[in-house]
Amino acid sequence: MRLLIEGARHRLQRAAAALCVVAAFGLPVAASAEVKEVQIARGFAIPHLPIMIMEHDKLLEKHALAAGLGDIRVTYSTIGGGSVMNDSLISGALSFGVGGPPPMLTLWDKTRSAIQVKGVCAEATMPLLLNTRNPNLKTVKDLTEKDKIAVGAVKVSIQARLLQMAAAKAFGDAEFARFDALTVGMNSPDASAALRSGAGEVNTNFSLPPFQYAELKVPGIHTLASSNDIMGGPHTFTMVYATSTFHDANPKTFQAFLAAIKEAIAIINRDKNGVARIYLEMTNSKEAVADIVAILDDPLVQFTMTPVGTMKFADFMYRIEALKNKPNSWQDYFFEEIQNLPGS
């Protein structure tokens, strides 16, 4: 055993001496290689425009090359529903996930002693509309067991949490789950199609742009509530999140991603007409360019990396015991790279 220890000591001494020689002559020291392939998820529709523009214009590849990472392969996949997104991120199938603050907060809470998921940046701030074709419904208080409400994922998606917040606001915190049994999990295009068709059990949809506006063009469909009303103001709708494992092992790739999404947002704000055409091309949507531009021109629709109102979700989820850990501020669940922003 003593001989083994002595041998190990001599090897360490020789390695240290070699490093001193490298440093003395200014020779480069090999660093841990970062990933050569990045997997990014995006959801459906306008709230995910920054990621869509990143994909269309190959912005991450551009910024990775500028950061000295060489040519990297970037794979994008479309996933509907926060629970599926979370499973993919935890399994390592995704480098960057996207979704609403509630699914991210759930992961942050559950992974604190392991891979530690945190927010990378916000993506979009915009209202969601709770639309219905039931003429008997005027407010959320009128919902009954005869109604079926489409949400991204039952109990855990941003739509599901907003519905719980609406129930708590109308009937008290003890009744937060009042509408859970009325919800069905559906992706946004299918949910909107079901509502507009007038067929099937779904007669209410917690929708999102552009689908919510198309729904309101159908006679008989009207809005019960806006998420901004439920939240008491604007809030982040979509955001990006990742594991600390990926963040810590790939600092340059992480910075390249932030630079890429920042450029994508600048493109959206600078060329809304061109971005609308890209959106229609990538989604195979039949909507008019003017309709998409009108949504992008809406002052309530903002693309920004700054988190807005996310602590309201965190406070509510902790209050109903959906979170075991209470964050002190939004900076607790976002990586340090954006903590200089005026978030909330």
PLM segments and residue spans:
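Short, glycine-/small- and polar/acidic-enriched structural segments
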Residues: 34-176, 181-185, 199, 203-209, ...
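Bacterial N-terminal signal peptides that target proteins for export
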Residues: 2-19
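Bacterial N-terminal signal peptides
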Residues: 16-28
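Conserved C-terminal helix/tail region of periplasmic/extracytoplasmic solute-binding proteins
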Residues: 317-344
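Short, surface-exposed acidic
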Residues: 69-75, 174-181, 283-295, 324-330
